[in-house]
Amino acid sequence: MSTILKWAGNKTAIMSELKKHLPAGPRLVEPFAGSCAVMMATDYPSYLVADINPDLINLYKKIAADCEAFISRARVLFEIANREVAYYNIRQEFNYSTEITDFMKAVYFLYLNRHGYRGLCRYNKSGHFNIPYGNYKNPYFPEKEIRKFAEKAQRATFICASFDETLAMLQVGDVVYCDPPYDGTFSGYHTDGFTEDDQYHLASVLEYRSSEGHPVIVSNSDTSLIRSLYRNFTHHYIKAKRSIGVSAGESKSATEIIAVSGARCWVGFDPSRGVDSSAVYEVRV
């Protein structure tokens, strides 16, 4: 299943491997929403999907709230505005208008993602979207993906929050999947960078949440730092293709780590009040 957005680090291509390490549970919690590829490819009873990027979360909320209105407005924009001057006018309004509604900002965000250079999402220090025009002949309008997303989104809660804030909201039995900005390859985290200190802090919080009994699964690049930070997790290695961030028309592969916390019990979780599954889960390797 493809996603609404083009997105750096999109997990669609590796989903068959990633799903092997996602155990059953009443809710999947994702502190780094990205393209929502994991939500779309899994079947948890409910989801808590978070991201620090308010434009991303606003898009998801607006599609979930009124899919048909969103499709109707966005389709028109795709039909009439595939021109460089239109792109920069829309980007200007997206960045600076004080009168733009949240609904139209969501429509513009999809437009900018699909018409901007290589689907990148980048902001300057002032918080302004600054990706140049992509000059594509016929940008794809993801109507089918929007409808599928809107259906699945009825099981989800979307919040604009940091990973700290999101992980503080865990409930008994929650499964945690984290796909943070990758070490050594990508530093963008909305307007601020995602530093080595952030990697250390995230790993510390995830170690603690794992010790509480939460299944924790983390994707990241295969670097010495990541192997060290998640040394108490089981490591699985996969090859993933990269297309965003390399020369146009090219792709390359890189090794990624899927770090999986050890199997634990869901202490205090009563399946009779939630999903019909065992109180003990087993990570499949």
UniProtKB/Swiss-Prot annotation:
Q: What is the originating organism of this protein? A: Escherichia coli
Sorted alphabetically, which InterPro entries does this protein's record hold?
Answer: Ade_MeTrfase_dom_2, DNA_methylase_N6_adenine_CS, M_m6A_EcoRV, MeTrfase_D12, SAM-dependent_MTases_sf
Enzyme class label: transferase
Catalytic activity of the protein: a 2'-deoxyadenosine in DNA + S-adenosyl-L-methionine = an N(6)-methyl-2'-deoxyadenosine in DNA + S-adenosyl-L-homocysteine + H(+)
Put simply, this protein is called Retron Ec67 DNA adenine methylase
Out of the domains of life, which is the source? Bacteria
Q: Where does S-adenosyl-L-methionine bind?
A: 7, 11, 51, 179
Gene3D superfamilies xrefs: Adenine-specific Methyltransferase, Domain 2, Vaccinia Virus protein VP39
PANTHER family for this protein: DNA ADENINE METHYLASE
What's the gene?
dam
Q: What is known about what this protein does?
A: May play a regulatory role in the functions of the retron.
Q: Which UniProt keywords apply?
A: DNA replication, Methyltransferase, S-adenosyl-L-methionine, Transferase, Transposable element
State which residue ranges cross the membrane. Answer: none
User: Per its UniProt record, what Pfam families does this chain match?
Assistant: MethyltransfD12
One biological process term in Gene Ontology = methylation
Q: What is the lineage of its organism?
A: Bacteria, Pseudomonadati, Pseudomonadota, Gammaproteobacteria, Enterobacterales
Q: Listed GO molecular functions?
A: S-adenosyl-L-methionine binding; sequence-specific DNA binding; site-specific DNA-methyltransferase (adenine-specific) activity
Family, according to the entry, reads as follows: Belongs to the N(4)/N(6)-methyltransferase family.
Give the EC number(s) listed in the UniProt record.
2.1.1.72
